Regions:
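All-alpha prenyltransferase/terpene-synthase fold signal
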Residues: 1-151
Length: 151
């Protein structure tokens, strides 16, 4: 379980990285921001580890899923590429949840799989700025979001 301070720190790091990825593309910024918010909130609901989660926050996520995300211009233009990443994120997250209490090897894999959401960042970077931008962002996420086992 992350602390409130850790969540604030992680949110700031993520926002700064998203700004670097998207430049002045407001739709791409909103897309990544929504995706992070959705996955964080759904993980909190699944784990039951955020007692401060409000009904309004849950409704916000429902609105994102049913209205705001599907009508986001960046997503609409690139959904053929992005949907496959959404499927991969979901699949990895489910596998991580299933194996997080398994043997030592399961726990190592779960530790890595749970952060699969960040793999969409280099894809968005590619769509906006090309392969060199993708490679740069790919390296940054591996450094920025690296955690000790068990964190």
């Amino acid at each position: 379980m992350t602390t409130h301070e850790e969540r604030l720190r992680d949110t700031l790091k993520t926002k700064e990285l998203i700004e670097e990825i998207v430049g002045n593309n407001k739709d791409a910024f909103e897309y990544l921001k929504m995706l992070c918010r959705i996955t964080r909130t759904l993980d909190d609901i699944y784990d039951g580890d955020n007692e401060n989660l409000s009904r309004e926050e849950v409704l916000e996520i429902i609105e994102y899923l049913f209205i705001t995300l599907p009508t986001n211009n960046f997503f609409a233009i690139h959904q053929d590429v992005l949907i496959s990443q959404h499927l991969s994120m979901y699949n990895a997250w489910m596998a991580a949840n299933k194996r997080e209490n398994g043997d030592e090897i399961d726990k190592i894999y779960a530790h890595v799989w749970r952060d699969n959401i960040f793999e969409v960042f280099p894809i968005v970077a590619l769509l906006i700025g090309g392969i060199d931008h993708m490679k740069c962002i790919s390296e940054k996420i591996r450094v920025l979001f690296k955690k000790e086992l068990g964190e």
